[in-house]
């Protein structure tokens, strides 16, 4: 497995993995994959990675700023997505470890993750890398007409 910085040319594969996550209904409130321009503008350029298996993008991890307020400049929210065909092969762990290292080296002091309670694999992965649950945001948003809760986890760097 190769984990490397995400490049613009990776986006079609990143978008395909993202689309798989959207289709599960357990990964995100998003209902459509954003354009490269939208995705690029939202994510911090120094904290985005892809993992390759056999030369193909098998997953990605990236960080968005938690807030535009200066007081929170060192807090990021990370997302990690793994292709269905690559799950349970260490891809998510390798990606999340890369983002944690990058965030720490880049001066961030906290990473957050918001995960649906039913996404046991993601909760397990995050907890295994030191993220701790700080609460449940009840009925925080609607997905396909239904209110959803989100488990909020964070890691102090």
Please describe what each predicted stretch is.
Residues 31-85, 96-97, 102, 156-157:
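Acetyl-CoA-dependent GNAT
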Residues 11, 15-41:
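Conserved GNAT-fold acetyl-CoA-binding loop/helix
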Residues 62-65, 112-116, 127, 132-149:
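Conserved catalytic-core motifs of GNAT/GCN5-like acyltransferases
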Residues 1, 56-60, 148:
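Glycine-rich phosphate/pyrophosphate-binding loop shared by adenosine-nucleotide-utilizing enzymes
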Residues 88-101, 123-128:
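Conserved acetyl-CoA-binding loop-helix of GNAT-fold acetyltransferases
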Residues 1-9:
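Conserved N-terminal entry element of GNAT/NAT acetyltransferase domains
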Residues 87, 113-123:
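Conserved beta-strand-loop-alpha-helix junction that forms the acyl-donor binding cleft
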Residues 103-115:
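Conserved GNAT acetyl-CoA-binding A-motif
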